Structures are given as C-alpha cells and as structure tokens.
Amino acid sequence: MDASPEPQQKGGTLVLVRRQPPVSQGLLETLKARLKKSCTCSMPCAQALVQGLFPAIHWLPQYRLKEYLAGDVMSGLVIGIILVPQAIAYSLLAGLQPIYSLYTSFFANLIYFLMGTSRHVNVGIFSLLCLMVGQVVDRELQLAGFDPSQDSLGPKNNDSTLNNSATTLIIGLQDCRRDCYAIRVATALTLMAGLYQVLMGILRLGFVSTYLSQPLLDGFAMGASVTILTSQAKHMLGVQIPRHQGLGMVVHTWLSLLQNVGQANICDVVTSALCLGVLLAAKELSDRYRHRLKVPIPTELFVIVVATIVSHFGQLHTRFDSRVAGNIPTGFVAPQVPDPKIMWRVALDAMSLALVGSAFSISLAEMFARSHGYSVSANQELLAVGCCNVLPAFFHCFATSAALSKTLVKIATGCQTQLSSVVSAAVVLLVLLVLAPLFHDLQRCVLACIIVVSLRGALRKVKDLPQLWRLSPADALVWVATAATCVLVSTEAGLLAGVFFSLLSLAGRTQRPRAALLARIGDSTFYEDAAEFEGLLPPPEVRVFRFTGPLYYANKDFFLRSLYRLTGLDAGHSATRKDQGPEVGVSNRSLVDGKDLGSVSSGAGLVVPLAFGFHTVVIDCAPLLFLDVAGMATLKDLRRDYRALDITLLLACCSPSVRDTLRKGGFLGEEQGAENELLFPSVHSAVEAACARREELLAADSAL
C-alpha cells in the first residue's frame, strides 16, 4: 500500500492516509467472471432475466388502481384519438398506405407497454423516421422500375404496376404492384433497423446513443422538418411534380414547385389555407391556455372529421379533381416474412435509421425520467424499441421510435404508467376493425396540413440558435452544420455531418484547453488563475501551472507551448544550449516576460536565460483526466529538461488513475520514495515543499 505524500491533519491530529491497493483483474478473468454470471441457471436468475426483458411484469402487480387508472385511461384515449389522424397523415411521408401506419401504431404501443422502462414515453410513428423510410422506399421503387410520379395514396394507384419502359431489378416482381413492393421495402428496412437496435441492446451499447449530442439532434430535427415541409408542399397546392431523390432534394423540389405553381388545384389551396388557419390558431390558443385546459383539444381529429364530411357530400374529388386518401381496408392482413434480398440492399440505410430512432428514444426516456424522479435503462430501451421494429415488421409495419409531442400530451393528460399505451392501442384497434373506411374521401391536402403543423416545435428551435451561440459557439456550429446539410444535401448526410462536427468540436476542446498560471488567494491554501482574478499572491520563485484538459497525443505540443509561454522559458531549447556550452550564444536576458515562444520545434538563434526567476514548476493535475503514451513521454522529457536546468518539476492533485499511469510509465523512476517527493495531494503542499527544499539548499550552501 502506498502512503500519501504527506499526512493529513484533522482536528489538530496528524492522520496517515493510505491508498488501498488496486484490484488488478486481467481481461480474461473479467470475461470469465461475466460469462459465468450470465450463464448461471437458477430460478432467481431466470425471474430476473424475464423481469428485465419485460418490466411490466414487475410494475403491474404494484399498480395503484385508484391513483393511476383514471389518468392512464384519459391519456390513453386522448393519445389514441390523436394517433388516428397522425397515422393517416404520416403515411404520406413514408409513401405507404394509411392502413400500415395504423398497424404500426397498434403494435408499437402494445410491445413498448411490455418492454419499456419509461412510464411516460409514447413510442409509435415519428415524422423524422417516416421521412427516412419514405426516402428509401422512393429510391427502391425507382430502382425497381416503378413510375416515381405515382403516389401510394388514392384510388388511381390501386392498379399501379411496373413502368413498361423500365427493367425490373427484382425477379418475380411483375406480380407485385407498387403498394405491395413499397411495404416490402419498408418492412425489410424496419427489420434491419430493429435487429441493429436489439444487437446494440444485447451488447450493452446504450451509451453509444449519447454521442449524438442535443445540438446535433435539434439541428437534425430542424433540417429534417424543412425537408418534410418541402415534401408536403405539393400536396397542399395540389401540384403533381416528380419526387426528387438524392443530393439537393429540397432545392430541386422547390424549383419544380415554382415551375408548376400555375397548375395548382384551387380546391386544395383553399382547403389547405383553411386547415392551416384553424390548426395554427388552435395550437396557439392551446399553448397559451394549456394550464387551464384539463384535456388538450384534439384539433386534428375535428379537422379531419369536418374535412371528410365536406369532401364526401361536396364530391370534391369528382368535381375538382382533389386527391383523397382512397380505400382504407379494415382488419389485419396475414403476416409475411420481409424479403431477405431487399434487407441486404437497405442494410446501410437501416444503420442511420436505427441510430436516430434509438437516440431520440433514449434521450426522451432519460429526460422525462429525470423530471419525474425515476430511472430508466438505456440498454433495455434499445431492446424495447428494437422489438417494436423487429416483431411488427412481420405484420406490415414500419420503423418507430419515441415521439416528443405525443409524450408531452400523455403527461399533460395525467399519464402515470404505460397502461395508457394499451388504451391507445384499443382506440387504434377500433379504427382498424370498424372506422377505417370512413376516411375514404379525406383530402390529402388536409393530411399534409396536419403534418406541417406538427413541425411547429422543431421549426421553432431556430429561435434557440442565438442563445446557443452565446453559450457555446462550437455547439451552435454543430447545429448549423447538421441542419444545413440535411436541407441542402440529404438527411443521411446531415446526420453524418452532425457526427463529424460533434467529434471535431470535442477534439478541438481537448486539443486546445485553457492553460493558466495560478497564484495564492490571500493566506488560504487555495490557488486560482492569476490572469482572471486580482489581488492574488504568486508564490515566490515557484510557477504553478494548470492545464484544464487531458494530456494526450493531440495536445502535447500545445501543452508545452502553453507552459513555455506562461513561464517564459523553453526548457527543451534551454537544456540543449546548456549542454552545448556558452559558445552557442547564451544571453543574460531573462525570458520571464510571458512572450509567445512560438512552435516547440527547434530553431536557430534562441536566447537562453541564465536567471530564470524560479526554481520549481508545480503542475496542477486536478483537471488532468488521463494520460496516454505521448502525454507520459512529454512529462518525462519535461522533467529531464528541467532537471538539466536545475529546476524541479512537481505534480499536485493527481487522480488515482493518473498516479497509476505515472507509476507504470516510469515517470517516478526506480528510487525509493520518489512518489512522495514528486506527487503531492494539493497545490499548496507542493509549493510549501518546494520552498522548504530551497531553504534547505540555501542553508547548506551558506554552511559551506
């Protein structure tokens, strides 16, 4: 056991603090122990495994019927009512029939009820994922030879087949119409994304989603919202334009809209204006008086009901050629295994889909868990969301994740547990079995308006950009880069750009952290930045240096430049000149003036001082998170150079991990007691030790 460099004083009594020896366990032993623990078969282990996979088994027996039931039923009914129009509307984004959105909402609510760890999050159709699914579906439809100008909704599309001028890429596809092939692509993509998420959950990779920072997610939501708005503009105007894909989709779509704006359907334009006015006004009033409203007003449902009645009795489709939702069948279709060939082709697209879905789900689950005082498991959330994609993929469903807007509605209407999801699923089931055909005459421009209004929250995030810039310019850059790339290039490229700039921002913050010389605060034992605070007392003939970041290969040169600039002494060059002798041009001029010495690389004509103005350099290692091999070599070279100049290098406030790295890296040498002479528990103790040693040396010289 290692003793600390000096005893700690407590109540006037000296207490010797000893560090416990670290428990060293090799990688093989650790893997064996974890494997043994995982493979242990017993009844308690089996029960814990089942309860871990299905948390509902744990909390359902503890359900407080009188306290929770009313709120869960109310929130479930409201969410179910909201889900129906949103599911039909979001089918436009995914390029699929509305019935598949209803299937997705039904199965996702039931599965997350059993497997989710969040009490409040609503998992189901999400606009951003619908957009990503729709883009892959459109691309694969084009590759398969289908006419890209045809849409999935509407009676005109029921007999849509392969374009006669195109060559199909799929053997036997001639018997599959457009809608059939579209759902094949969507289910294959969903199954692959779900498998990725389940695999991440099994491998305990829930922490990976946290690398998608909040500015990245907000910028991605903003850019994707602009893309969604662009894709719905043609439906609100009633203009038939080709569906653009790939680079610059947003720009090409707006150019096509401007070129064909004269062909707009007046009926769709008037209907869109009325629906947008009603929806936006109702949303603004709901936001303003939300504290007085016990239950949110289901404006979308009212708009859909009224619009469907007007469209049916006004015969808008027949008289004005306004496109409608078309036939929505009732009941469930037989399950089908997703096409393995398509799965391999969309495997890369499924990665971004899985990452975005899991990141939003985990971040929302953790956010609401913190605000309501309970905890969630990121790994179990991955399993839950993954199963919400894997199992429903066999029942003609597409990708799902947590949705912020519906989660907020659940909380506002009194949701207490995930039992509300069962109630929501029951409402969707009622529509699936009985009410779905009633939406036959619903205009698609109404659905587009519902989608656009649902983007209010994401589009409003642009107002947060100035405050984000004042708080952190690096995060603001990540936000702008992600959003701009989503809009100007593609959503997948936007996600990659966000990850790249996030890593670049992280590297920049660690590559050039703040460095400062410290001085003493009065007669206390605390030290602070001498450049930031007035009235501090610098220790005599001692330089205390602080580097607020890790020391590794990317910033080792910046570490040395900062130290040399602040202390006014380039130790490496000075030590070299001293070894070569006085003929190299040594000058008596001191370098303790704080001027920048520039690069650490060697150069001719460097002026080397004889009087440095200090005899000890103390490095405050409290902010030093870790050392790598390059950082260790830097400290060892620095100690060697200082020793050549008769300057002592001391380290203070080293964490146990840094101490271990120093010991294993040979910084402490082989001398007995070297750790007590080089490492100190505080900056003040290091300064006092340096001054005491200096006085001892001066006394010894005087005696001689």
From Swiss-Prot:
Residues the record lists as Phosphoserine modifications: S587, S590
**Entry's transmembrane regions:** 68-90, 94-116, 185-207, 260-282, 295-314, 347-369, 382-404, 417-439, 477-499
Disruption effect?
Answer: Mice exhibit hyperoxaluria with hyperoxalemia, nephrocalcinosis and calcium oxalate stones in their renal tubules and bladder. They also display hypersulfaturia, hyposulfatemia and enhanced acetaminophen-induced liver toxicity.
InterPro entries for this protein: S04_transporter_CS (IPR018045), SLC26A/SulP_dom (IPR011547), SLC26A/SulP_fam (IPR001902), STAS_dom (IPR002645), STAS_dom_sf (IPR036513)
GO BP terms, alphabetized: chloride transport; oxalate transport; sulfate transmembrane transport
- Give a yes or no for keyword Ubl conjugation in this entry: no
Glycosylation annotated at which residues? N158, N163, N588
Where does the source fall among the domains of life? Eukaryota
Q: Where in the cell is it found?
A: Cell membrane; Basolateral cell membrane
Official protein name in the record: Sulfate anion transporter 1
Q: Which GO terms describe its cellular component?
A: basolateral plasma membrane; plasma membrane
Looking at the record, the residues that make up the STAS domain are 532-690
Q: Which CDD domains would you find in this protein's record? A: STAS_SulP_like_sulfate_transporter (cd07042)
The job of this chain, per UniProt, is described as: Sodium-independent sulfate anion transporter. Can transport other anions including bicarbonate, thiosulfate and oxalate by mediating sulfate-hydrogencarbonate, sulfate-oxalate and oxalate-hydrogencarbonate anion exchange. Mediates sulfate-thiosulfate anion exchange.
- Which family is this sequence assigned to? Belongs to the SLC26A/SulP transporter (TC 2.A.53) family.
Keyword annotations for this protein, in alphabetical order, are: Anion exchange, Antiport, Cell membrane, Glycoprotein, Ion channel, Ion transport, Membrane, Phosphoprotein, Transmembrane, Transmembrane helix, Transport
